[in-house]
Amino acid sequence: MRPVEVLGKRWAHPIACASGALAAHRPGMENAVLRGAAAIFTKTVTESPREGHPGPVFVDYLDEGYALNAMGLPNPGPDRMVVEIEEFRDEFDVPVYASVAADGPEGFKRLARAFSGVADGLELNVSCPHAGKGYGAELGSDPEAVAEITEAAVRAFDGPVSVKLTPNVDRETLLEVAAAAIDAGAEALTAVNTLGPGLRIDLRTASPVLGAGVGGLSGPALKPIALRVVADLALEFGEEVEIIGVGGIRNGEDVVEFLFAGAKAVQVATAAREKDFGDIAMETSHILKELGYDGPEEAIGAALPEYRERLRRLGWCQ
């Protein structure tokens, strides 16, 4: 499969390791690359180290099509993550993007400065549905807040910035938030974070299964929502920014769907617990060849003309 240019760097293929537990430290990043990831998005880092929510923090209902997680943004803080990235770079020549979260523009600015000259780019996490008051989706549903945060990070960082969007808003708000991020200097949009929060109850204890009570929904059930968000963003902003799709991707067919919807690249999280990134990349390459595409970039947005036409019939699109 042909390499792709994403966020200012050459990726061997369009499939990256999403921000999550696997990319919380150097050994996990190395594991992801050895299993074929073309790029790494680190576990989200906050200004100070966090222990996160009490366990359980992840519950697997993949036999029902989804998983729930409520990590609570556990991380070692920026000083330690900088060391983890630098040690990783000593061994691997693979793009690394730092995922960061704070409770306002000043915090994002400080984090951006901390990773300047270290990470190849930033991903601003303004979309976690269970991070706690003042963080995550609470910020990411407010276009004005997203604009201020993005501008602060862009000014302080020496590379490209992507804003990770929440699916927990209506279509109009989604597009307003995306426009605010782009106007403030974002070069990419990552879509989407987990959906929710959701709840499961243990029948034996009559208590929530997750330690935090509620958590974000990931896995295959998230994919139709993520695809729709990617397609909506591509219709409105595909000429202006790169779009990175994430949510429910398990195999090559899923990747090609996201490419068709307008994503330039994708991230894999939940499925990486059981399947190698390289296997998904190989499947993607075979499917693209079967469909007559020489590479992934030729497939980007293939479904958008018909998607636009069908939205017109609903009165949702010009």
UniProtKB/Swiss-Prot annotation:
NAD keyword on record: yes
UniProt-annotated binding residues for substrate: 43, 69-73, 125, 193-194
GO biological process, one term: 'de novo' pyrimidine nucleobase biosynthetic process
Keyword Transmembrane: no
Enzyme Commission number(s) of this protein: 1.3.1.14
Active-site residues per Swiss-Prot or TrEMBL entry: 128 (nucleophile)
Top-rank taxon, per record: Archaea
Requisite cofactors: FMN
InterPro entries attached to this UniProt entry: Aldolase_TIM, DHO_dehydrogenase, DHOD_1B, Dihydro_DH_chainA_dom2, Dihydroorotate_DH_1, Dihydroorotate_DH_1_2, Dihydroorotate_DH_cat, Dihydroorotate_DH_CS
A Pfam family of this chain: DHO_dh
GO cellular component, one term: cytoplasm
UniProt KW keywords: Cytoplasm, Flavoprotein, FMN, NAD, Oxidoreductase, Pyrimidine biosynthesis
Catalytically driven reaction(s): (S)-dihydroorotate + NAD(+) = orotate + NADH + H(+)
Subcellular location: Cytoplasm
Note on how the cofactor is bound: Binds 1 FMN per subunit.
Pathway recorded for this protein: Pyrimidine metabolism; UMP biosynthesis via de novo pathway; orotate from (S)-dihydroorotate (NAD(+) route): step 1/1
Sequence positions that bind FMN: 19, 43-44, 125, 164, 192, 219, 247-248, 269-270
Family, per entry: Belongs to the dihydroorotate dehydrogenase family. Type 1 subfamily.
Function: Catalyzes the conversion of dihydroorotate to orotate with NAD(+) as electron acceptor.
Subunit annotation: Heterotetramer of 2 PyrK and 2 PyrD type B subunits.
PANTHER family: DIHYDROOROTATE DEHYDROGENASE (FUMARATE), DIHYDROOROTATE DEHYDROGENASE (QUINONE), MITOCHONDRIAL-RELATED
Name of the featured protein: Dihydroorotate dehydrogenase B (NAD(+)), catalytic subunit
Organism field: Methanopyrus kandleri (strain AV19 / DSM 6324 / JCM 9639 / NBRC 100938)
Lineage, top ranks: Archaea, Methanobacteriati, Methanobacteriota, Methanomada group, Methanopyri
Name of encoding gene: pyrD
